[in-house]
Amino acid sequence: MKEASRHEAVNRIYLRREKSGAWLLMLWVQPNSARSALAGLHGDRLKVVLAAPPLDGKANKELVRFLSRALDVPRKNIEISAGLGARGKTVRIINPDPDALGARLP
């Protein structure tokens, strides 16, 4: 039963697993929202709305903070690996619990 839940996260279109065991999360980010939240899908990416402006890296910092809380992963284990200046971003999550990750993502 536990093995099946580990495969749930793999089947999400916006989530990929690296050989290293880290996960890549493909996101579409919308800054300047009233609050930070997961907001469904945007094409093949998970949409995240952020309560921060896209200035001076504030939205990127808020994205890491929000994902850390939402996914219960330490901030040091979350890095934006692509799209620092774009709305389409790839976030690398190092050593998450696959069951917890699957339970917290839509």
Give the residues covered by each predicted segment:
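Contiguous, often N-terminal, cationic amphipathic patches that form binding interfaces
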Residues: 1-64, 70-75, 79-84, 89-106
